[in-house]
Amino acid sequence: MSLGRVTVTAVRNLHPVTLNPSPRINILYGPNGSGKTSLLEAIHLLGLARSFRSQRLSPVIQHEQPACTVFGQVLWNDGRVRNLGVARNRLGELQIRIDGQNVRSAAQLAESLPLQLINPDSFRLLEGAPKVRRQFLDWGVFHVEQRFLPAWHRLQTALRQRNSWLRHGRIDPVSQAAWDRELCLASEEIDSYRRSYIQVLKPVFESVLHELVELDGLTLSYYRGWDRERSLGEVLAASLPRDQQLGHTQAGPQRADLRLRLAAHNAADLLSRGQQKLVVCALKIAQGHLVDRARRECIYLVDDLPSELDEQHRRALCRLLEELHCQVFITCVDLEALREGWRTDTPVALFHVEQGRITQTHDRE
């Protein structure tokens, strides 16, 4: 799967552009501030209907423009073609179109265009709050288990009902019991999908990590969000007074986490910044392998790689990306830092970016 064509209008400083990228490696090079990251942001907007640089979309829309738009043509390996379009205006209104039809759910975009982002903020996967790691985990489960999303929606509905009751106490005992039962059923289902996914992810992650860096003793484990020796129903009953005091549900899948440990310590506390970056890269590439096993592929957006890794590790990462046989968009300031990182038979397209203008220069010599 790859983006065969992408058209970007009014995204930050980018001039209107239509690109026909390589189905494999695409290198965007040019000075800092030229718009390289903005193109990655536009592709991210196309796949997830949101930016990875700003929680608000208004900064993404070009100055004095009413809206930004991104269109893309997704080419599947079996010959299918899917046309995607996303538009955001300054009022925050979102329009999503798939094959000419308006759709309401960004999940349909994510399903059509699986994206993995590796950028300087990727450290947050190790250092950040559990929510960041849950999002990483659920991205993977979503793309390999079709039953996950309906269960997740059921969980969110049940949680909202229970938390509302905890804050206001306006629910009869029969309804309360029914929502608790629904919460437990959805939670157990989600936990089973997550556990199954982690069991498959761990050996792939360990293998990929070994290709990047030697970190003996690094372990990846999954915490489901409540005591593994007790049912969620038991935990909810025991924690009810505290939940009422706080006004929200403390235990459940919404408290799940991935834990990376090294020598019995939080790995983020012991690893250097470079080692953390390599661990995150290994996690995200491992996820790509699992998506590939599900007979799909994801597209990698890699921002400013040369400034994050030395030449040895940069070449190792490029080799791992090549082995996935997926499409990659990767940015750099100095083209020479990435030009020679690929096999001679790998299609590589080069795009020069300067002052918001993107020009395809030539393929690798």
Curated annotation (Swiss-Prot):
One of its GO terms (cellular component) is cytoplasm. ATP binds at residues 30-37. It comes from the Bacteria. One of its GO terms (biological process) is DNA synthesis involved in DNA repair. GO terms for molecular function: ATP binding; single-stranded DNA binding. Coiled coil: none annotated. InterPro entries: DNA-binding_RecF, DNA-binding_RecF_CS, P-loop_NTPase, RecF/RecN/SMC_N, RecF_2. Pfam families: SMC_N. Its main location: cytoplasm. It is found in: Cytoplasm. Keywords: ATP-binding, Cytoplasm, DNA damage, DNA repair, DNA replication, DNA-binding, Nucleotide-binding, SOS response. The RecF protein is involved in DNA metabolism; it is required for DNA replication and normal SOS inducibility. RecF binds preferentially to single-stranded, linear DNA. It also seems to bind ATP. Belongs to the RecF family. This is DNA replication and repair protein RecF. It comes from Azotobacter vinelandii (strain DJ / ATCC BAA-1303).
